[in-house]
């Protein structure tokens, strides 16, 4: 049977295509928008059955042009949290997703989709409950609104619907995201270009570089998606983060030490890195004051209750792997 991946040339989508290939799956229809043509590089080492532009996909999907479809991994979206064109964002992330969902429900196709931790916005709790969801931008709202649709249809759906609230994902195949790429990606490039990594200084009671995020490797994101793909009886909206908040200092320090290791230099403590000027703290920008999350951490209770029991990579493990991959691409 056929599998469909939307956003297939993007960060998470291309990692899913590659992982499906490694399982022997090649009857994959890749759907994307290659207006930004450089994304094609993410699919060069992947095997797909066909490629479709997103503008023609839904109508052909509705008509049944692809025969028997087992599942769709719906990763296609505008993920730029700085996008201010609300009409574009809602058409791309909400309306388009509803159309894909409607076809899946009508044809009993597994529907696994990308939600986002941006649905929580200014909340201090990160549990999949309506009362703690406070999106701060139109991107978060587009994901939040679609999740509300899912909550309404879940009780009567006859096929799987699984949504994943991605936290701060990092890993291979994100180069095309440019300024929206992960902190690890930018730290890697900054250190290679300038010989140091710059982090925000003290803010809102957090010491320099100690603001925290739930950083999750794309390796783990793919594993969770495939777990639900293999278990079509499990539905719901699930946080997809490591469940562990770690400071930006951990990212920067791991990037520095991994690059030092690749240069046959010994690892240094964070204090030594700061003392040597390898990590530098800059004043917290006035433009971000009052708009910046100093802490995120996925509550994994619902994910674990669904039966996913594999451990998640720590920043030290995942970023080390990622930096070595990036270094190999240079």
Swiss-Prot record:
<dbReference type="InterPro" id="IPR011912">
    <property type="entry name" value="Heptose_epim"/>
</dbReference>
<dbReference type="Pfam" id="PF01370">
    <property type="entry name" value="Epimerase"/>
</dbReference>
<feature type="active site" description="Proton acceptor">
    <location>
        <position position="177"/>
    </location>
</feature>
<comment type="similarity">
    <text>Belongs to the NAD(P)-dependent epimerase/dehydratase family. HldD subfamily.</text>
</comment>
<feature type="binding site">
    <location>
        <position position="39"/>
    </location>
    <ligand>
        <name>NADP(+)</name>
    </ligand>
</feature>
<dbReference type="InterPro" id="IPR001509">
    <property type="entry name" value="Epimerase_deHydtase"/>
</dbReference>
<feature type="binding site">
    <location>
        <position position="169"/>
    </location>
    <ligand>
        <name>NADP(+)</name>
    </ligand>
</feature>
<dbReference type="GO" id="GO:0050661">
    <property type="term" value="F:NADP binding"/>
</dbReference>
<feature type="binding site">
    <location>
        <position position="143"/>
    </location>
    <ligand>
        <name>NADP(+)</name>
    </ligand>
</feature>
<feature type="binding site">
    <location>
        <position position="92"/>
    </location>
    <ligand>
        <name>NADP(+)</name>
    </ligand>
</feature>
<dbReference type="GO" id="GO:0005975">
    <property type="term" value="P:carbohydrate metabolic process"/>
</dbReference>
<keyword id="KW-0119">Carbohydrate metabolism</keyword>
<feature type="binding site">
    <location>
        <position position="168"/>
    </location>
    <ligand>
        <name>substrate</name>
    </ligand>
</feature>
<feature type="binding site">
    <location>
        <position position="54"/>
    </location>
    <ligand>
        <name>NADP(+)</name>
    </ligand>
</feature>
<feature type="binding site">
    <location>
        <position position="179"/>
    </location>
    <ligand>
        <name>substrate</name>
    </ligand>
</feature>
<comment type="subunit">
    <text>Homopentamer.</text>
</comment>
<keyword id="KW-0413">Isomerase</keyword>
<comment type="pathway">
    <text>Nucleotide-sugar biosynthesis; ADP-L-glycero-beta-D-manno-heptose biosynthesis; ADP-L-glycero-beta-D-manno-heptose from D-glycero-beta-D-manno-heptose 7-phosphate: step 4/4.</text>
</comment>
<comment type="function">
    <text>Catalyzes the interconversion between ADP-D-glycero-beta-D-manno-heptose and ADP-L-glycero-beta-D-manno-heptose via an epimerization at carbon 6 of the heptose.</text>
</comment>
<feature type="binding site">
    <location>
        <begin position="200"/>
        <end position="203"/>
    </location>
    <ligand>
        <name>substrate</name>
    </ligand>
</feature>
<feature type="binding site">
    <location>
        <position position="177"/>
    </location>
    <ligand>
        <name>NADP(+)</name>
    </ligand>
</feature>
<keyword id="KW-0521">NADP</keyword>
<feature type="binding site">
    <location>
        <begin position="11"/>
        <end position="12"/>
    </location>
    <ligand>
        <name>NADP(+)</name>
    </ligand>
</feature>
<feature type="binding site">
    <location>
        <position position="186"/>
    </location>
    <ligand>
        <name>substrate</name>
    </ligand>
</feature>
<feature type="binding site">
    <location>
        <begin position="32"/>
        <end position="33"/>
    </location>
    <ligand>
        <name>NADP(+)</name>
    </ligand>
</feature>
<feature type="binding site">
    <location>
        <begin position="75"/>
        <end position="79"/>
    </location>
    <ligand>
        <name>NADP(+)</name>
    </ligand>
</feature>
<dbReference type="GO" id="GO:0097171">
    <property type="term" value="P:ADP-L-glycero-beta-D-manno-heptose biosynthetic process"/>
</dbReference>
<feature type="active site" description="Proton acceptor">
    <location>
        <position position="139"/>
    </location>
</feature>
<dbReference type="InterPro" id="IPR036291">
    <property type="entry name" value="NAD(P)-bd_dom_sf"/>
</dbReference>
<protein>
    <recommendedName>
        <fullName>ADP-L-glycero-D-manno-heptose-6-epimerase</fullName>
        <ecNumber>5.1.3.20</ecNumber>
    </recommendedName>
</protein>
<feature type="binding site">
    <location>
        <position position="292"/>
    </location>
    <ligand>
        <name>substrate</name>
    </ligand>
</feature>
<dbReference type="GO" id="GO:0008712">
    <property type="term" value="F:ADP-glyceromanno-heptose 6-epimerase activity"/>
</dbReference>
<feature type="binding site">
    <location>
        <position position="213"/>
    </location>
    <ligand>
        <name>substrate</name>
    </ligand>
</feature>
